[in-house]
Amino acid sequence: MGMKGMKKNEENTGNPDFSAQLEQTANDYIFKKCLECGFDVEWREGFSVHLAACAELPTRFGTFVIAAFSEESNQKEHTAIVHGSVVGEQDCPLRVHSQCHTGDVFNSLRCDCRSQLEAALEYIASRPCGVVIYLKQEGRGIGLINKIRAYHLQDMGFDTVDANTCLGFPEDARDYRVASEIIQLLRIRSIALLTNNPRKIKGLKKEGITVTRRIPVLVGETSFNKKYIQTKRDRMGHLE
């Protein structure tokens, strides 16, 4: 029975059988989109994430499919923004983008995160296929509150590396296990990674992902983020 044919009325309101039927029908519709895209919707042994939902996502860069993934151990939710058919693709353009609440949402000028995200989406939309994986790894893995604490230290003269280490964190606390699992669930065979960060390439290769090449992400600097970008080059090995 379709969703339109399942109208709630006084008889079925609160009926557990009806509720279960409605939930199953909704799940069937949700996973139909995932299956149409060819993504892996099965639980994989040893994986920390699973594919939970897919839907179309129109943006100013073009129309994508947004795939949502749930990480069971900590309830984090990650997403993949997919353009075109990526199943079985080799040399698939892909960016792994760590969440930046201040930059991506509030358009902060302290970093170049939003500019890189938009550049990646624009690039991928111009190609036959591609993906942006958006990970809940705020502040290079230290979380939003600690990131804002690090901002305060930067206001006092610390650079982005020293601010993190003064708070007791490594300069970069991210890992790429979840990203590698998402790439496998999207059934991508190899990737061309959009990044200026060699550690991302190394991290993904360590998790078994084939990275065929690096695609530089070229964005402009501002007076606000110039020191931040230079520190990433000088102290974290970022490339241009």
What are these regions (language model features)?
Residues 2-240:
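Catalytic domains of riboflavin
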